[in-house]
């Protein structure tokens, strides 16, 4: 069984993502019913990358989330600590500067980036607050943060249906399409244990970011948090 537990030991999380790398993008598309593409577009709009800006895309995986920044003329650095993900990404997008790095100890100097973003990865860092502080460290003063992460649906009846999907349907569907379906049991458990929108905004502020705010996507299944260095 290739999966991590909720204590999120880095070696377990790394092995889990190495195992799912080959079919990661396809599986995400199926499990989200295509919504992942909409969420990625929302991240790009929130970051609003300008030509020549330096953007860090942390937990970039295979680089699917990074390429749109390059398409807008930004200098994007996809960073991930799963070598399996990086290998798949480098094979598909050889022009991007894929970089191996731990979210709690980023291999970049202070104030390197104009904008930093992490999509569906903060939840997997062993210490999310440390991860947010590291992102703060490598961002220039006045730079911006965008976090796209699973959250808590705002409509109570829908929340009940969504939790049922997470805990029952999602792992079953993953068994049909993923190269490591047990990893998606961890996905469901980690989403259920993650803070709500207000809780994550408080964590962003505690890490030193200014004026954290968020907007909900897909009824709160996902929340897009923004803040300034």
Swiss-Prot record:
A GO BP annotation: menaquinone biosynthetic process
GO molecular function: demethylmenaquinone methyltransferase activity
Binding site for S-adenosyl-L-methionine: 62, 80, 102-103, 119
Family: Belongs to the class I-like SAM-binding methyltransferase superfamily. MenG/UbiE family.
Catalytic EC class: transferase
Species the sequence originates in: Nocardioides sp. (strain ATCC BAA-499 / JS614)
Protein name (Swiss-Prot/TrEMBL): Demethylmenaquinone methyltransferase
Coiled coil, from the record: none
UniProt superkingdom: Bacteria
């Amino acid at each position: 069984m290739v999966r991590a537990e909720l204590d999120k030991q880095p070696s377990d999380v790394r092995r889990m993502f190495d195992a799912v790398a080959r079919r990661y993008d396809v599986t995400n598309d199926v499990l989200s019913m295509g919504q992942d593409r909409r969420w990625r577009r929302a991240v790009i709009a929130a970051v609003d990358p300008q030509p020549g800006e330096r953007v860090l895309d942390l937990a970039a995986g295979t680089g699917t989330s990074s390429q749109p920044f390059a398409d807008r003329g930004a200098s994007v650095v996809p960073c991930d600590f799963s070598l399996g993900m990086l290998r798949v990404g480098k094979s598909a997008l050889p022009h991007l500067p894929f970089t191996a790095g731990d979210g709690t100890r980023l291999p970049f100097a202070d104030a390197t980036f104009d904008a930093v973003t992490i999509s569906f990865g903060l939840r997997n860092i062993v210490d999310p607050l440390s991860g947010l502080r590291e992102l703060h460290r490598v961002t220039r003063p006045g730079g911006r943060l965008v976090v796209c992460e699973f959250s808590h649906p705002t409509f109570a009846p829908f929340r009940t249906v969504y939790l049922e999907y997470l805990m029952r349907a999602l792992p079953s569907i993953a068994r049909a399409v993923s190269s490591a379906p047990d990893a998606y049991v961890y996905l469901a458990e980690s989403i259920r244990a993650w803070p709500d929108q207000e809780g994550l905004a408080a964590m962003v502020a505690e890490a030193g970011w200014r004026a954290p705010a968020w907007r909900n996507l897909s009824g709160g299944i996902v929340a897009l948090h923004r803040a300034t260095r």
